[in-house]
Amino acid sequence: MSLDTKTIGKIAHLARLEFDDKSLEAFSTDFNKILSWIDKLNEVNTDNVEPLIHMSHELNVLREDIDKVTISHEEALKNAPKKDSDYFRVPKFLS
């Protein structure tokens, strides 16, 4: 499949793109190369190929999520350079 410059100009207009004549010619060449590559993909026989949901059959193996206390709130606040009651104090970073 190949499109002429006039058709590509109409498509560009619908997409609200503006090209000068030289750029439109270059874009037309590139666009037609992409379309010819897609035509080659359409020639591939995929009769016995199942559609893919994922690119890989690999699964994520995750550990079981177990709730446990590793450090208490008070211990965490002991290491804080600044604190306010039960909260960490941090420098303001919004301008």
UniProtKB/Swiss-Prot annotation:
Reaction(s) catalysed (UniProt annotation):
L-glutamyl-tRNA(Gln) + L-glutamine + ATP + H2O = L-glutaminyl-tRNA(Gln) + L-glutamate + ADP + phosphate + H(+); L-aspartyl-tRNA(Asn) + L-glutamine + ATP + H2O = L-asparaginyl-tRNA(Asn) + L-glutamate + ADP + phosphate + 2 H(+)
Q: Could you provide one GO biological process annotation from this protein's UniProt record?
A: glutaminyl-tRNAGln biosynthesis via transamidation
One GO term in the molecular function aspect is: asparaginyl-tRNA synthase (glutamine-hydrolyzing) activity
Q: Which UniProt keywords apply?
A: ATP-binding, Ligase, Nucleotide-binding, Protein biosynthesis
The EC category is: ligase
Name the Enzyme Commission number(s) assigned to this protein: 6.3.5.-
Q: Which Pfam families match?
A: GatC
User: What family does the entry list?
Assistant: Belongs to the GatC family.
HAMAP family in the record, alphabetically? Answer: GatC
What is the name of this protein? Answer: Aspartyl/glutamyl-tRNA(Asn/Gln) amidotransferase subunit C
Q: Which organism is it from?
A: Cytophaga hutchinsonii (strain ATCC 33406 / DSM 1761 / CIP 103989 / NBRC 15051 / NCIMB 9469 / D465)
